[in-house]
Amino acid sequence: MSVIELFQKLLKFKSITPNDDGAFDFIQEYLGNEWNCIKVDMEGVKNRFYYKKFNDTKQHLCFAGHIDVVPVGNGWEVDPFAAEVIDGVITARGAQDMKSGDAAFLYACKNAKNFDGTLSILMTSDEEGEGTYGTIKMLEHLKQINMIPNYAVVAEPTCEEVFGDAIKVGRRGSINGYITIKGKQGHAAYPEKCINPVHNFAHILPKIAGINLDNGDEYFAPSKLVITDIRAGMEVTNVTPNELKIMFNVRNSTNTTKEDVENFINQNLKGLDYDFRITQGSFPFVTNKTSKVVIAMENSIYDILKIKTKHSTAGGTSDARYFGAFGIEAIEFGVINDTIHSINEKTTVKEVEGLTEVFENLIKNF
């Protein structure tokens, strides 16, 4: 079975979060008896850890991904689960995100003849959803049984314009804030009898909206406070509002913590009557550019694609953050990501074959 045939097989599973649609049974059969399998299934989510010990070296490289895809939606030009190749292009749900990566590392790992240590594959059926019972639960189990990998490659689509142009060496965290400025409702004709929370907050908005909370560094852009919602009043012109609500998000680097954001907001709102709540949806992580897995991936991309790749930490969150939280040196590399989650999501045969060759080279030379 070629990697493209494997890719097509995976695409035909209607594995919408958190349903694997039988894909994991197929994968276990595909890998064969040489690969051991650990299962952690919780709350309708399936997690699989396949591993093969080549020798007693403690080095452990894990490839990671998710089998689940987002819902299809309407307006597709082709059947999103037919996985047909037309002029070198495969249009299907999950083509970029991320069954291309899954196929590439499954093929590369199955066909690896030698490796200095242990090769493993971690996959979940819930990355596109909440992920509460996904990758993190498998990693918790692996820690309990002392099988945490040293290094991880998450095959998410990372490239931006040209295949091979970017690897993720980290991800920003996500901090959400909810502010309520309190006032006193009244008639617009008698502003002296009202406490208008909009007026009281107006001079503060420029001090927090779009402000960089740090200066960034060689890995991360500055952590910026982004206002996502402001609302007050009853959509009438003669009543002042009783309260003003503001929501914001900060995609934070390792240079800014939730406590930093909390202190920044409280300092700026001093003197106002307000409520403030802050939550951390995910934590940032970064893998040092001198890490073995970073250097090895750079070399493999150059060997196969003749491209000097760049390091990136841009974009949203991914399951790579869980590897970082467990002290695993993790990076991400996959195909171009220009149609992820969209109607007519697609990738090319050339990219999938190239990704497979990069992974094969990485395994061979790691």
UniProtKB/Swiss-Prot annotation:
InterPro entries, alphabetized: ArgE/DapE_CS, Bact_exopeptidase_dim_dom, DapE_proteobac, Peptidase_M20, Peptidase_M20_dimer, Peptidase_M20A
Molecular functions per Gene Ontology: acetylornithine deacetylase activity; metal ion binding; succinyl-diaminopimelate desuccinylase activity
Organism: Aliarcobacter butzleri (strain RM4018)
Quaternary structure note: Homodimer.
A Pfam short name: Peptidase_M20
Function, in words: Catalyzes the hydrolysis of N-succinyl-L,L-diaminopimelic acid (SDAP), forming succinate and LL-2,6-diaminopimelate (DAP), an intermediate involved in the bacterial biosynthesis of lysine and meso-diaminopimelic acid, an essential component of bacterial cell walls.
Protein name: Succinyl-diaminopimelate desuccinylase
Cofactor note (record): Binds 2 Zn(2+) or Co(2+) ions per subunit.
Pathway named in the protein's UniProt entry: Amino-acid biosynthesis; L-lysine biosynthesis via DAP pathway; LL-2,6-diaminopimelate from (S)-tetrahydrodipicolinate (succinylase route): step 3/3
GO biological process, one term: diaminopimelate biosynthetic process
Cofactor: Zn(2+); Co(2+)
